UniProtKB/Swiss-Prot annotation:
One of its GO terms (cellular component) is membrane. The chain crosses the membrane at residues 80-100, 103-123, 148-168, 190-210, 252-272, 310-330, 355-375, 423-443, 455-475, 487-507, 541-561, 603-623, 640-660, 675-695. One of its GO terms (molecular function) is oligopeptide transmembrane transporter activity. Expressed in leaves and at low levels in root cortex. It is found in: Membrane. Pfam families: OPT. Residues 1-54 are annotated as: Disordered. The keyword Transmembrane helix applies. Keywords: Membrane, Transmembrane, Transmembrane helix, Transport. It comes from the Eukaryota. This is Probable metal-nicotianamine transporter YSL13.
Length: 724
């Protein structure tokens, strides 16, 4: 079987993989982030190797042997969903802010797991003191909370608020002249967004349910994120793990408070967009004009502490290459390569080079890894089928596992409980058919440009793509969600045509495909987590459904709060540039109109960077010993459009973590993710009161702005004339 580098090795010095890149560009690669403290998981192994490794490892289930496993109904408690509801709100705000600023979303599983454990422990402790505790807090219930929370806040990403939904708006369409008409514009509105998400977000939950036993037990797919989450939860429910978790929560709380009040303090100095600490020319005014400055953002310092070092360095190198070298050189061609009269934000001018060269890097990287994943999946499936001497892919049934290989106590116990609570086949197939039928009839009422027969084709093809993505995720922790979405943009946009609203149809089809492929892989990750914590597949499925329903309401409401409170969302250079929105719409325009709209020599540069992305990835795979020193093309592409200020924040975060690891690696690995999560959460939650103040028309009282000495002299002279 083909070997795949371990995602967790990125910090340690081996080949960084898609797990690294997921935290690089959320619009391209999204996985259920694994806790940074558990980096021991790797690619899928063959059955014998996995069994031998587990047999040699200390038994986890013997530690919990004296604790009864609650029934699947007992795992679904009211307190679990109450805690999940509030955590979904909290993390949806954080993810939405990240989505609308840079699109870089790190793993938040550590904070989700910690806070879920902490709040339910508080709940049970309070009830126990008054003698009303009826059911102890179990790891199965903890798994239900984790699943519900991640399913809920994942809609804040996969719902397309930072990419395909915002791409449909008049605000983003106004950045260019192509497809800037009523047929290709649909402005966001709370009602249709919630309806659209309910129609497309559930169907992926039913597609792969019949294959859960095959992929988890028979093929022994690792699902590194799901495995790491299970290790985290199992650890919480041991005496030593509970003490460590309490200390981690304390660290998270301290930095949450500091980060929140730092955001509050900064707000007083931001009377306009160009004021405040986030516009501090820390590297000089000349560097500031080229987007090089430290903006005092706890969020992206925290992101830098969570992302692997190679990711942070790649982002910084991309910023230096683009804003430090390429854009100043291309700007000198103004009047030759593009009209000197065009504004800086025009896609026919300077902005066109920034956006389309970034797209070329992203597509080159995505296409290479898509083909690589298909090849790895094919080889792995062929190997598995040969071992079982079977010509067809088996489907989950109600029988027990039969195997001639010796299994450990843990594996036997987990297999027994995993096949005990079956999800009936008619629920899976019937659910898929019913939801698909409703969606086929209703989505065209919301997006008339996307016809019913196009949605039918998408739903016929989607299970195959969902299987490929879920299998690849199980092997490598690599979810190519928006690669499939971008393919849908091209395919359905070209099918519809420019004269029939092809841009809008392509973007809507992207949303349909992304939601199906994403939720299918996410559910399989949850099944793996449940398998390792003895949580019932039924409780996992129900929790995922409830979490998705929460997300379909909460995420649009959070987005609407941002959209109404801040009128500069999607505008380049603003606090919320939403870079992926412009990128997705530009991809849709390319799919419909071709390359005729590109400025001079832009296409040649795109070809060069597309090829460079493939070559760099090829070198990374062919020379794994030095791949940790080779930057990731997709990571480099992110600052091409929005600038390098966040890259400096992230680099500072990675330096902090690197020094901490040198001084005391054990503490850095244990508490680093909690500290980073506190910084991200505190700064993220500050957006809520900031939004309320903006809606109430309460403006900051002070503008802190930085001027050159010459400009300052002119301002002083002007103010002097006013005083006379």
């Amino acid at each position: 079987m083909a070997t795949v580098p371990t995602p967790s090795e990125a910090h340690g010095g081996a080949t960084p993989t898609a797990a690294d890149v997921e935290m690089v560009e959320a619009s391209e690669l999204r996985r259920r982030g694994k806790p940074s403290g558990d980096r021991a998981t790797g690619p899928s192994r063959d059955g014998a190797a996995a069994a031998a490794e587990e047999a040699a490892a200390p038994s986890v289930e013997r530690v919990f042997a004296d604790r009864p496993v609650p029934s699947w109904r007992e795992q679904l408690t009211v307190r679990a969903f109450v805690v999940s509801f509030f955590l979904v709100i909290m993390f949806s705000v954080i993810v939405m802010k990240l989505n609308l600023t840079t699109g870089i979303i790190p793993s938040l599983n550590v904070s989700a797991g910690l806070l879920g454990f902490f709040f339910v422990r508080l709940w049970t402790a309070a009830i126990e003191r008054v003698g009303l505790l009826r059911q102890p807090f179990t790891r199965q219930e903890n798994t239900v909370i984790q699943t519900c929370v991640v399913a809920g806040y994942d809609i804040a990403f996969s719902g397309g608020f930072g990419n395909y939904i915002l791409s449909m708006s008049e605000r983003i369409a106004g950045l260019g002249t192509e497809a800037n008409n009523a047929q290709n514009i649909k402005n966001p509105h709370l009602g249709w967004i919630i309806g659209f998400l309910f129609l497309v977000s559930f169907i992926g939950l039913f597609g792969l349910v019949p294959l859960r036993k095959v992929m988890i037990i028979d093929y022994k797919l690792t699902y590194p994120s799901g495995t790491a989450t299970a290790f985290l939860i199992n650890g919480f429910h041991t005496p030593h793990g509970a003490k460590i978790a309490a200390k981690q929560v304390k660290k998270l709380g301290i930095f949450f408070i500091l980060s929140f009040f730092w955001g509050f303090f900064q707000w007083f100095y931001t009377a306009t967009d160009d004021c405040g600490f986030h516009k501090f020319p820390s590297l000089g005014l000349q560097a500031f004009q080229h987007k090089f400055f430290f903006d005092f953002s706890p969020t992206y310092v925290g992101v830098g502490m969570i992302c692997p070092h190679i990711v942070n360095v790649s982002v910084l190198l991309g910023g230096i290459l683009s804003w430090g070298i390429m854009w100043p050189l291309i700007a000198k061609k103004r009047g030759d390569w593009f009209s000197a009269d065009l504004p800086d934000g025009s896609l026919h001018g300077m902005q066109g080079y920034r956006v389309f060269i970034a797209i070329a890097l992203i597509l080159g990287d995505g296409l290479y890894n898509f083909l690589k994943m298909i090849i790895l999946t094919a080889f792995s499936l062929r190997s598995q089928i040969k071992k079982k001497n079977a010509s067809t892919l088996p489907v989950s049934d109600d029988g027990m596992v039969t195997t001639t290989a010796a299994v450990s106590y843990d594996e036997e116990r987990r297999n027994e409980l995993f096949v005990k609570d079956q999800i009936p086949w008619y629920v899976a197939y019937g659910g898929y058919a019913v939801v698909a039928a409703i969606s086929i009839g209703t989505v065209p009422q919301i997006i008339p440009q996307l016809k019913w027969y196009q949605i039918l084709v998408a739903y016929i093809v989607a299970p195959i793509l969902a299987f490929c993505n879920a299998y690849g995720t199980g092997l490598t922790d690599w979810s190519l969600v928006t690669t499939y979405g971008k393919l849908a943009i091209f395919a359905f946009g070209a099918w519809t045509g420019a004269s029939h609203g092809g841009v809008l149809a392509g973007l809507a089809a992207c949303g349909v495909m992304m939601n199906i492929v994403s939720t299918a892989a996410d559910l399989m990750q949850d099944f793996k987590t449940g398998y390792l914590t003895l949580a019932s597949p039924r409780s996992m499925f129900v929790s995922q459904v409830i979490g998705t329903a929460m997300g379909c309401v909460i995420a649009p409401c959070v987005f609407w709060l941002f959209y109404k409170a801040f009128d500069n969302i999607g505008i380049s250079g603003s606090d919320y540039p939403a870079p992926n929105a412009a990128v997705f719409r530009s991809i849709a325009i390319l799919g419909v109109d071709g390359f005729s709209s590109l400025p001079k020599n832009c296409l040649n540069l795109c070809y060069a960077f597309f090829a460079a992305a493939i070559v760099v990835n090829l070198i990374r795979d062919l020379v794994p010993k030095v791949s940790r020193f080779i930057p990731i093309p997709m990571a480099m592409a992110i600052p091409f459009y929005i600038g390098s200020y966040f890259a400096i924040d992230m680099f500072i975060g990675t330096v902090i973590l690197f020094v901490w690891q040198r001084v005391d690696r054990a503490k850095a690995d244990t508490y680093g993710p909690a500290v980073a999560s506190g910084m991200i959460c505190g700064d993220g939650i500050w957006v809520l009161p900031q939004s309320v103040l903006a809606l109430a028309k309460v403006k900051p009282p002070i503008c802190m702005k930085f001027l050159s000495r010459r400009t300052n002299d002119k301002v002083d002279a002007f103010l002097t004339t006013l005083g006379k």
